[in-house]
């Protein structure tokens, strides 16, 4: 199925560009909106996004644009790849233009002052729109370089899921569907925090046992927190949970992993984020997640430990000592431990 109208991708970053390329390769006409006219002109003239995805050719079917009002008017299916800190500011003035649109969030973040996920913000801005999210183990550069990849589109709107699958599904990109939008989106946001910790552990040359422990305990923490908020724990055993967690905590291509690695090399948080040159959602998510988990009294020792290192002046050695002294609880929280 080929969309009769062009499809919009909002955001000029690496992931937005990778998704725009996939759509164009599948025969779709794509309008990729970005705020910076110089960036748009660079992509238009060089067919490359030199700032965020250097070395990857941008498909001729991707048209970089800077007129947001016209882009929203022309397109029915709209992928939103804006930073979490900018999403509301960019789209709020155009809420009438979003009525009855299909809005699919690609952003894995949480709004700091409200603890709202991106799809919840989209619902606030455009209550008459149809909302979905995409999440999974999806490193932008690997998608752009046609590594075999799978993702999840999640929405209670089955037709929206089907349209996204038809638009994106291709020879190297497989799209599964889920109705647990909240769980899928929450998994994508939470794992960024643990990727920072994984990068820090790698820079400190910690062993494979340690890294495995961190990833599996991170999964337990994520699931414990998400279930308290009403998500389906089974979602965290799929691509948007353990799948995304593994790739983000294992790959130097992950932005949040890079921030953690830079911290382990001795850089300050400000220096680490500055060196990255892109948005690392995990830093902001850590702040709001620590506050929310304390408020809800959810046991999240890894979150508390990383927060202590980044924002409370604790050293890694001090935090490790506290973590290893903690009382060990059950390994898996969501099955009975009696009768086995």
Swiss-Prot record:
Organism superkingdom: Bacteria
Pfam families in alphabetical order: NAD_Gly3P_dh_C, NAD_Gly3P_dh_N
PROSITE patterns attached to this UniProt entry: NAD_G3PDH
Reactions catalysed: sn-glycerol 3-phosphate + NAD(+) = dihydroxyacetone phosphate + NADH + H(+); sn-glycerol 3-phosphate + NADP(+) = dihydroxyacetone phosphate + NADPH + H(+)
Enzyme Commission number, as recorded: 1.1.1.94
Alphabetized UniProt keyword annotations: Cytoplasm, Lipid biosynthesis, Lipid metabolism, NAD, NADP, Nucleotide-binding, Oxidoreductase, Phospholipid biosynthesis, Phospholipid metabolism
Gene3D superfamilies in alphabetical order: N-(1-d-carboxylethyl)-l-norvaline Dehydrogenase, domain 2, NAD(P)-binding Rossmann-like Domain
Residues holding sn-glycerol 3-phosphate: 108, 136, 191, 244, 254-256
GO cellular component: cytosol
GO biological process terms on file: carbohydrate metabolic process; glycerol-3-phosphate biosynthetic process; glycerol-3-phosphate catabolic process; glycerophospholipid biosynthetic process
Annotated pathway: Membrane lipid metabolism; glycerophospholipid metabolism
Catalytic residues of the enzyme: 191
Sites where the protein binds NADPH: 14-15, 35, 108, 140, 255, 281
GO molecular function, one term: glycerol-3-phosphate dehydrogenase [NAD(P)+] activity
Main location: cytoplasm
Subcellular location: Cytoplasm
Enzyme class: oxidoreductase
Protein family according to the UniProt entry: Belongs to the NAD-dependent glycerol-3-phosphate dehydrogenase family.
Functional note: Catalyzes the reduction of the glycolytic intermediate dihydroxyacetone phosphate (DHAP) to sn-glycerol 3-phosphate (G3P), the key precursor for phospholipid synthesis.
Protein name according to UniProt: Glycerol-3-phosphate dehydrogenase [NAD(P)+]
Annotated organism of origin: Pseudomonas paraeruginosa (strain DSM 24068 / PA7) (Pseudomonas aeruginosa (strain PA7))
């Amino acid at each position: 199925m080929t969309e009769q109208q062009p499809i919009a991708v909002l955001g000029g970053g690496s992931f937005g560009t990778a998704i725009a390329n996939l759509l164009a390769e599948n025969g779709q006409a794509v309008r990729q909106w970005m705020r910076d006219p110089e960036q748009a002109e660079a992509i238009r003239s060089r067919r490359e996004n030199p700032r965020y995805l250097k070395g990857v050719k941008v498909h001729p079917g991707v048209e970089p644009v800077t007129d947001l009002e016209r882009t929203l008017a022309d397109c029915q299916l709209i992928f939103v790849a804006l930073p979490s800190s900018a999403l509301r500011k960019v789209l709020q003035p155009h809420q009438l233009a979003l009525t009855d649109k299909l809005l699919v969030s690609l952003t894995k973040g949480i709004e700091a002052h409200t603890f709202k996920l991106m799809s919840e913000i989209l619902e606030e801005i455009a209550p008459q729109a149809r909302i979905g999210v995409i999440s999974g183990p999806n490193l932008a550069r690997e998608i752009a370089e046609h590594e075999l990849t799978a993702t999840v589109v999640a929405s209670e709107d089955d037709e929206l899921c089907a349209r996204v699958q038809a638009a994106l599904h291709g020879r190297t990109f497989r799209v599964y569907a889920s109705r647990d939008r909240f769980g899928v989106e929450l998994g994508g946001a939470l794992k960024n925090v643990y990727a920072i910790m994984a990068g820090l552990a790698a820079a400190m040359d910690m062993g494979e046992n340690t890294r495995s422990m961190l990833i599996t305990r991170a999964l337990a923490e994520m699931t414990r927190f998400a279930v308290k908020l009403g998500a389906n724990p089974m979602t965290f055993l799929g691509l948007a949970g353990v799948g995304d967690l593994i790739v983000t905590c294992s790959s130097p291509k992950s932005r949040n992993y890079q921030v953690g690695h830079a911290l382990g090399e001795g850089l300050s948080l400000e220096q680490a984020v500055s060196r990255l040159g892109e948005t690392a959602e995990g830093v902001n998510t850590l702040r709001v997640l620590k506050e929310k988990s304390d408020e809800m009294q959810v046991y999240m020792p890894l979150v508390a430990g990383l927060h202590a290192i980044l924002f409370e002046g604790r050293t890694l050695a001090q935090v490790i000592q506290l973590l290893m002294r903690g009382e060990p609880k059950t390994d898996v929280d969501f099955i009975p431990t009696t009768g086995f």
